[in-house]
Curated annotation (Swiss-Prot):
Biological processes annotated in GO: phytochromobilin biosynthetic process
Catalytic activity field: (2R,3Z)-phycocyanobilin + 4 oxidized [2Fe-2S]-[ferredoxin] = biliverdin IXalpha + 4 reduced [2Fe-2S]-[ferredoxin] + 4 H(+)
Organism: Synechococcus sp. (strain ATCC 27144 / PCC 6301 / SAUG 1402/1)
Enzyme class: oxidoreductase
Gene label: pcyA
Pfam families to which the protein is assigned, alphabetical: Fe_bilin_red
InterPro entries named in the record: Ferredoxin-dep_bilin_Rdtase (IPR009249), Ferredoxin_bilin_OxRdtase (IPR022870)
Signal peptide as annotated in the record: none
Keywords of the record: Oxidoreductase
Name of the protein in question: Phycocyanobilin:ferredoxin oxidoreductase
EC number: 1.3.7.5
Length: 248
């Protein structure tokens, strides 16, 4: 699929999704030395299918850097009824860093779910003092439509924000907070020193595996993929693109 078509997909999405996608990639470019993701499955960069008669489009943009084995931004659209942004940064297991994750789900001009977090997949199983200081310093507006985390949400931090934005002002405030989280994360990652202790690296690996296993329990995502592409394809997509386990 040509790059012009992929750009066209982003331009069709809800304005908040467009703005967050643009801001995410700009932040990556500012703070990190990006390279193409070496393990990108050749057939999963751009995907089309049908979901209940509606055209389903999925675009995946993936990179890697010194600090992150994968930086993943997924954009998706189902007909005119559903727009999706999904973003996760997977640290290399030689870096004791949390997992940045952000998701937006919208349809018919309304964002129904917006979540952002830095999940403490770290040796101490909590965010470091530097992260806490950086996040605490960000503007922290009040949101009205707070949503309940899923039952498998023990992977999230106390800073996790999960809302249904009720106004353009809340959408703008969420955008600022999500990009603030990402900037703190990229700044901390760029300054981080690689681990050398094998036990510490093994602990980070274990924590990332648990994060991925919990995220794979998201039945809503799996059901959409199964309806559009079948069970086997959905399982492959969940385990190789969305939440692949680290091997390094």
């Amino acid at each position: 699929m040509s790059s012009s078509t992929r750009v066209g997909l982003k331009e069709q999405l809800h304005p908040l999704i467009r703005d967050l996608a643009t801001g995410i990639e700009a932040t990556w470019q500012r703070w990190l030395n990006l390279e193409p993701y070496a393990a990108m499955p050749a057939d999963l960069g751009y995907i089309e299918g049908k979901l209940e008669g509606e055209r389903l489009q999925i675009e995946n943009r993936c990179y890697q850097s010194r600090e992150f084995r994968k930086l993943h931004l997924e954009l998706a659209r189902v007909g005119n009824n559903l727009d999706i942004l999904h973003c996760v940064l997977f640290p290399r297991t030689t870096f004791d860093l949390p997992m940045f994750g952000a998701d937006l789900v919208g349809g018919r001009g309304q964002i129904s779910a917006a979540i952002v977090d830095l999940s403490p997949t770290t040796i101490a199983r909590e965010l470091s003092n530097d992260y806490i200081a950086g996040l605490t310093a960000l503007p922290n507006p009040t949101f009205q439509g707070l949503r309940e985390l899923p039952t498998w949400g023990d992977i999230f931090s106390s800073f996790c924000l999960f809302i249904r934005p009720g106004s353009p002002e809340e959408e703008a405030a969420f955008l600022d907070r999500a990009l603030g989280f990402l900037q703190v994360h990229c700044q901390q990652a760029a300054a981080a020193t690689a681990l050398t202790d094998p036990e510490a690296i093994a602990t980070v690996l274990e924590q990332q595996r648990y994060y991925c296993e919990q995220q794979r329990r998201n039945d809503k995502t799996r059901r959409v993929l199964e309806k559009a592409f079948g069970d086997d394809w959905a399982d492959r997509y969940m385990t190789t693109m969305l939440f692949d386990l680290p091997s390094d």
